[in-house]
């Protein structure tokens, strides 16, 4: 897109797409041909940041999040990794070097199993000097943003996501 004349790009993704979005943000932020200026920022919603599935909320939120179970995710992770290590930074953004990333926001539900992964990822990025912020939506489970118009947290999350991207594009 940048080669076609677009001067500002944003990257967003939800769930596994959040994992891919964070990986792409890392790649674009460190790309010498983009010189860092083309990437306006990014948003990851309920991202899978740790494919080792070692975050504490897998245990503490498992019963509260019926849409995203450990058994279900374990099978998907194994298929995605295809024999590669779960802690490979190319697959698990939590284990990557995060210094120099473009500004991003992470939105996650307070009742989802990926809560601790999101917290750890944003804390690590912030410690590396990245403009990274976490928004935790009370009572929301995995995939809550797809319920826009039905859940207040979904409406608020989409609004905040849009605010951040508008702010980044105005610069």
Predicted regions mapped to residue ranges:
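Alpha/beta-hydrolase superfamily serine-hydrolase fold, recognizing
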Residues: 1-171
């Amino acid at each position: 897109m940048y080669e076609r004349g677009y001067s500002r790009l944003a990257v967003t993704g939800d769930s596994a797409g959040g994992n891919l979005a964070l990986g792409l943000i890392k790649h674009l932020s460190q790309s010498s041909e983009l010189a860092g200026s083309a990437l306006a920022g990014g948003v990851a919603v309920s991202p899978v940041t740790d494919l080792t599935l070692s975050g504490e909320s897998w245990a503490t939120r498992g019963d509260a999040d019926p849409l995203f179970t450990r058994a279900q995710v374990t099978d998907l992770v194994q298929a995605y990794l295809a024999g590669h290590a779960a802690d490979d930074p190319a697959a698990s953004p939590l284990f990557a070097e995060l210094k120099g990333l473009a500004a991003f926001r992470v939105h996650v539900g307070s009742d989802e199993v990926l809560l601790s992964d999101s917290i750890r990822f944003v804390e690590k990025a912030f410690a590396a000097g990245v403009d990274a912020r976490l928004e935790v939506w009370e009572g929301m489970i995995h995939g809550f943003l797809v319920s826009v118009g039905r859940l207040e947290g979904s409406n608020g999350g989409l609004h905040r996501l849009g605010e951040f991207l508008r702010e980044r594009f105005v610069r």
